[in-house]
UniProtKB/Swiss-Prot annotation:
CDD domains: GT_MraY. It is a multi-pass membrane protein. It is found in: Cell inner membrane. Keywords: Cell cycle, Cell division, Cell inner membrane, Cell membrane, Cell shape, Cell wall biogenesis/degradation, Magnesium, Membrane, Metal-binding, Peptidoglycan synthesis, Transferase, Transmembrane, Transmembrane helix. This is Phospho-N-acetylmuramoyl-pentapeptide-transferase. GO terms for cellular component: plasma membrane. One of its GO terms (molecular function) is phospho-N-acetylmuramoyl-pentapeptide-transferase activity. The keyword Nucleotide-binding does not apply. It comes from Parasynechococcus marenigrum (strain WH8102). Belongs to the glycosyltransferase 4 family. MraY subfamily. It catalyses: UDP-N-acetyl-alpha-D-muramoyl-L-alanyl-gamma-D-glutamyl-meso-2,6-diaminopimeloyl-D-alanyl-D-alanine + di-trans,octa-cis-undecaprenyl phosphate = di-trans,octa-cis-undecaprenyl diphospho-N-acetyl-alpha-D-muramoyl-L-alanyl-D-glutamyl-meso-2,6-diaminopimeloyl-D-alanyl-D-alanine + UMP. Its EC number is 2.7.8.13. The gene is mraY.
Length: 368
């Protein structure tokens, strides 16, 4: 591996600079939407949520330290990450409620209010699952909390509950809207697909949360993209769910002020699972599965890298127990790290990739 420790840093490798540029980009996107898209009011929820989340995180992180909520770093991970041991985790507990509470206040009556309540509930539910997982990791002083099967079961139960309420209310379309006026009719298959989306997206965002500011920055951009495409759809857009997306984007921007390199706190499973659940809930209620798939391209790549790595290793494993590896290490961000690219470079590059996927998702958004 290339030695990068003594190499001079470029300006984009400064965590404060790169995080500030990301925040400016998200703000510019919301301002542009408010100026040119009818009925768009994305900036105010963004600013309120960002400010409150940043303040709550600033007040809460010292408390996490006092409670000894220090992250346990996995031994088999990159050696450079061992210096992160002891950094407070469970940061999602500080900012996810901010996004859901501010988002829930956008509409207080009618179907919009009910949908906001449902999305907030599934987001907080996954936050609790992630929190339980983080807590078990901390109390056991290992990098693993819940068993994979146990975590999957809890995620599935929460997803089924959300889908049952949505089915009862008739909120979810049985077809998936695609670009160019195409639709994919699924009928009853939309329900197993919906559960798969919750499981896949929440675990993809969880896998992405491996470098300082990576998941929080990517999440803020994807929430912005989802909000803008919601306002561009139909005649009046979907101001309520779009506003919720912006409060979640703001929550992660506020957290990024403390999660940028060098991170003062990690979101933990508490935050990453909640992020994926919020995106999934919004996508299912607004028939935005296609935009989420495209805009979350980095999340998808991180998840696929793990699936490919495990599959190839198992299928090529010999008598000595060793198999081939496609990547130096999975998820994908570790592959670049072990190739000699610094964490400070990988993160803004993944942010730029996410911004590109968001723009592509806006260009290829469904028209209905």
């Amino acid at each position: 591996m290339t030695d990068i420790s003594n190499r001079p840093r470029t300006w984009w490798e400064n965590g404060t600079v790169s995080a500030s540029l990301l925040a400016v980009a998200v703000l510019a996107g919301s301002l542009a939407s408010d100026k040119w898209v009818p009925n768009s009011q994305l900036t105010l929820p963004l600013l309120i949520s960002t400010s409150v989340a940043a303040l709550v995180a600033a007040a809460g992180i010292p408390r996490l330290k006092a409670l000894k909520m220090g992250q346990v770093i996995r031994v088999e991970g990159p050696q450079a990450h061992q210096s992160k041991a002891g950094t407070p985790t469970m940061g999602g507990l500080l900012v996810v409620p901010v996004g859901t509470i501010v988002g829930g206040l956008i509409s207080l009556e009618g179907t919009e209010a009910q949908q906001l309540l449902a999305v907030s509930a599934i987001t907080l539910g996954y936050m609790v699952i992630g929190g339980f997982d983080d807590w078990r990791s901390l109390t056991r002083q290992t990098n693993t909390g819940l068993t994979p099967r146990g975590k999957l079961l809890l995620q599935s139960l929460m997803g089924v509950l959300f889908l049952a309420v949505a089915a009862w209310q008739g909120w979810i379309s049985s077809s998936v809207s695609l670009p160019f006026g195409w639709t994919l009719p699924l009928g009853w298959l939309i329900w197993p697909l919906g559960l798969f989306v919750f499981l896949a997206e929440s675990n993809a965002t969880n896998l992405t949360d491996g470098l300082d500011g990576l998941a929080s920055g990517c999440g803020a951009l994807v929430f912005l993209g989802m909000a803008v495409q919601l306002m561009l759809r139909g005649h009046t857009g979907d101001p309520a769910l779009a506003g919720f997306c912006m409060t979640m984007a703001g929550a992660w921007l506020g957290f990024l002020m403390h999660n940028r390199h060098p991170a003062r706190a990690f979101m933990g499973d508490t935050g990453s699972l909640a992020m994926g659940a919020a995106l999934s809930g919004v996508a299912l209620l607004s028939d935005s599965l296609w935009p989420l798939l495209v805009m979350g391209g980095v999340f998808l790549a991180e998840s696929l890298s793990v699936i490919i790595q495990v599959w190839v290793f198992k299928t090529t494993k010999g008598p000595d127990g060793q198999g081939r590896r496609v990547f130096r290490m999975a998820p994908l961000h570790h592959h670049f790290e072990l190739g000699g690219t610094s964490e400070r470079t990988v993160v803004p590059c993944f942010w730029l990739a996410t911004a590109g996927f968001v723009l592509l998702g806006l260009l290829l958004r469904p028209t209905i």
